[in-house]
Amino acid sequence: MEQFRGTTILSVRRNGKVVIGGDGQVSMGSTIMKANARKVRRLYNGKVIAGFAGGTADAFTLFERFESKLEKHSGNLTRAAVELAKDWRTDRILRRLEALLTVADSKASLIITGLGDVIEPEQSLMAIGSGGSFAQAAAKALLENTKLSARKIVEKALTIAADICIYTNLNFTIEELDSES
């Protein structure tokens, strides 16, 4: 069976805000299966935002696990991310899950992978998925050359990615939090 694939998730932190946005397209092979999936959501009583790229069912499993880690560690994003990454890498069932997560709270932004990596991005910017590099390049240019808000940068960069990446569409879900940095 062919794998569900492709998406674009982008996070920007600027001027007291952190924003994560993603498109809504779910593709299987060359077929668009759904155009309005919600790949970005709030967790931990709205204090954390998270986005995923990869298998949808896998991502929901990981969101549930991550939220339970947040509960266990009193909302400590980094500790919860490290604990999820450890489980993801060592648990035989979780190891088969194919997804990447971006997570952010008021203090930190992280990418969590199934290889056990927890990556803190440079320059307050992170992107994952098939259109991630396009969105990241666009957002980097906008961060360096404009005074646009974090939300506007995410909107514009996702639009550029959707113009280039066939696995990314214009049905965006965008979540925003106040940020300390």
From Swiss-Prot:
The residues the entry assigns to the signal sequence are: none
Enzyme Commission code: 3.4.25.2
* Pfam hit, one: Proteasome
Q: Name one GO biological process term.
A: proteolysis involved in protein catabolic process
Q: Which UniProt keywords apply?
A: Allosteric enzyme, Cytoplasm, Hydrolase, Metal-binding, Protease, Sodium, Threonine protease
Question: What subcellular locations does the record give?
Answer: Cytoplasm
Q: Which GO terms describe its cellular component?
A: cytoplasm; HslUV protease complex; proteasome core complex
A Gene Ontology MF term for this entry?
threonine-type endopeptidase activity
List the PROSITE patterns: PROTEASOME_BETA_2
| TM segment ranges | none
Listed CDD domains = protease_HslV
Q: Which Gene3D superfamilies match?
A: Glutamine Phosphoribosylpyrophosphate, subunit 1, domain 1
Q: Kindly state which reaction or reactions the protein catalyses.
A: ATP-dependent cleavage of peptide bonds with broad specificity
- Coarsely, its chief localization is cytoplasm
Q: Does the keyword Cytoplasm apply?
A: yes
- Residues where Na(+) binds: A162, C165, T168
Q: Active-site positions, per UniProt?
A: T7
Task: Explain the purpose of this protein.
Answer: Protease subunit of a proteasome-like degradation complex believed to be a general protein degrading machinery.
Binding partners and assembly? A double ring-shaped homohexamer of HslV is capped on each side by a ring-shaped HslU homohexamer. The assembly of the HslU/HslV complex is dependent on binding of ATP.
Q: Which NCBIfam families match?
A: ATP_dep_HslV, PRK05456.1
Q: Which HAMAP family match?
A: HslV
**UniProt similarity note:** Belongs to the peptidase T1B family. HslV subfamily.
Q: What is this protein called?
A: ATP-dependent protease subunit HslV
Q: Which organism is it from?
A: Coxiella burnetii (strain RSA 493 / Nine Mile phase I)
Q: What lineage is on file?
A: Bacteria, Pseudomonadati, Pseudomonadota, Gammaproteobacteria, Legionellales
**Gene symbol of the encoding locus:** hslV
